[in-house]
Amino acid sequence: MNAVGRVAPVITPSVLGIGHGGCIAGWQKDQVMAEEHSVARKTLEDRNRASDLERVRHSCAHVMAAAVMRIWPNAQLDIGPSTNEGFYYDFDIPDHRFTPEDFPRIEEEMKKIIKENQVFQKEIRTREEVKALLEAKGQKFKLERLNDIPEGEPISTFTNGEFMDLCAGPHVMRTGNIKAFKLLRVAAAYYRGKETNPQLQRLYGTAFMKKTELEEWLQMMEEAKRRDHRKIGKEMRLFAFDEDVGPGMPLWLPKGGILIAEIEKLAMETEFAAGYERVKTPHLARENMYTTSGHLPYYADSMFPPIEMKETMADGTEKVERYYLKAMNCPHHHKIFASYPRSYRELPLRLAEYGCCYRYEQSGELFGLMRVRSLQMNDAQIYCTPEQFADEFKAVNDMYLKYFKIFGIEKFQMRFSTHDPERLGQKYVNEPELWKKTEDMVRDVLIKSGINYVEIPNEAAFYGPKIDVQVWSAIGREFTLATNQVDFAVPARFGLVYRTRDNTEATPLCIHRAPLGTHERFIGFLIEHYAGNFPLWLAPEQVRILPIGSEQMDFSEALRKRMHDDGIRVTLDCSGDKIGGKIRNAETDKVHTMFVVGHKEQEANSVALRVHGKGDQGVRPVEEVLADLKQKIAARAAD
C-alpha cells in the first residue's frame, strides 16, 4: 500500500511560465498492482516532477471549477486533479444535474476566464485563515479536506480571479497559458469513493499544449469508441454481464473462453520452459492469513466482507471463524512455500497460478472488463537467494518482452519505483542494504536490457522496489498492464526460511510478477488493440467454410471435419444465403479466414482463400493452405 506523503511548497521554473506548488487537498488513485488501487496524497517529489502538460491540465480543472461557480454559485466543490486523460472536478449542485447540453455553456465561460489571462496566485495561510475562508464560502467538502492535512504542514491556496481553491498546484502562471481544452463527459462519483457518502457529479475534461494535439487526441478517442471492448465484446459474443450474477462479475461466453484458453496455454508453455511449477489455491482463506500478510486491516475496504462460519475445533469446542474471498494469490503461495522445509538447492522456486481473485470495487468505478470484482490473474511468486535475484529479475523482464512481441505491443514503458532513504522504518521496511542492493540490481537489469523505463523516487511498495508496466494500444491509448515487484518483508512475516549452504536459516527474497495481468484487463486491452480482429492463432473462429451451393456441401463438411480433427477452430456456413451474403456475415463476425468453395474449387481440391479485412487471396490447393494455416497457428504468427 502507498503511504501518505508529506507535502511542502516548492518553486519550479519552466520555459512555459509554469507556476509553482504541490496539491495538498487533492487525492489521487495510483495503481500499485494490476487491478489494485490505493489512494495517496501527492508528495513534494511528485510536484517537482510534474510535467508541463500536468500543470496545464490541473490549471484547466481550476478554470472549469471557476466557470461552474460563475454559472451555479451554490455549487459545492470537492477535488479536481489532473489525470492521464486530462482532468476532472467533483461537484455537488443541489438543483442541477450536468448533461452534455451544459458543456458549450461551461466551455464558453472557461474561454472568457482564459481570455482574462488571470494570474494563478499562491498564498501560504494558517489553518484558521483557510477555515474562515472556506466557511465564508460554505464549502463543506473543502473543510473536511482541510482536516486531512496534518498539523504543522504548510497550507496553501491558489486564486485566479474571484476563484480560490485549497490547493498547492502545480499550475501555469496565467489562465492564458491554456491553449486547447474540451469537456468530455459527466459521471457519478461518491465522496471519498465510499458508497455510504453523498454522490457527487464528476465533470471530466482534457487539455493539451496545442490545438493540433487536442484534435489528434479527439480523433483517437473516436477510434477508441469504435474499438470499445464493451461494444465489440457484445457484438462478438465474447463475454456478458448479468444482474443476477452481480456487477463486475463477467460471464465468459464460448468465444471468450477460447481467448482465455489460448492465453493460458501460452502462459503455461512459456512458464514451463522457464522452470515454473503450477499450483492451485482455494478461493478463500481464514482471516488470520491476511492479518499475517498485512492485507488486513489496511486492504479491508477492497476485500469482500468476511464469511462467518461456526466450526468444531480439534478439542471438540466450537469457534466462529471468519473467511475472506481472496483478493490476491501471494499469501497462499507463501503457505505453499512453508508447507515443508526448504533447502537452497530448491531455489529459485517459481510458483505460478492463474488464480481467481475478488476485489470489492465500488459500483461506480466498475467499467467493462477493465474494472471488475472477479478476476483471474497471471500470478507467480519467485523465491530466490540474493545471489540469484538479478538473473531471476532479468528472466521476468525477458518474459515481458517475449509477450509484447507475440501480441504486437510496440510501445511500452516500465516505471521503476524506488524508496526514500529518509523514510525507512516509516513508509518503507527498514532494510537499507537490501533496498540499495535490489534497486541497483533492478536498475542494472533495465539498463542492460535496453528497456524503456523511467525512475520514480519514493513510490516503491513498502516491502521493496517495483515496476509498473504501461503499454500502448495500436491507436496510441495507454493502459496499465501488469506489475513486477520485489518483496523482502512479507516472507519474513510468514516465517519463510530455507537452509543455506552453511546449514543456517535464511529468508528468501520474493519476486511478485504478473506479466499478462488479469484475463479481464488484458483481453479488454487486446480487443481494443486488435479492434476484435485477432491474429489467426488467437481468433475464436479461425476459419469459416463458405460453400457456394448445396452441391459443395459434402466436400465442405469433409473438409471441416478434417480441419477440426487437426485442431483448427472451423465452422461451416450451412445457410441458404448467396455467397455474397455469406462473405458479408463472415466479415461482420470477424472470422479470420474464409474458404469459398464452388464447383471449380471442389473439382481441383482447392479453395478460394479470403482473409478478414484483406479480401481475396486467390485460389490455393487444400493441402497447401492447410499446411500454411497450421504453421502460422503453431508459431503464433502475427498477421
What are the roles of these predicted feature ranges?
Residues 80:
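N-terminal single-stranded DNA-binding subdomain of primase/primase-helicase replication proteins
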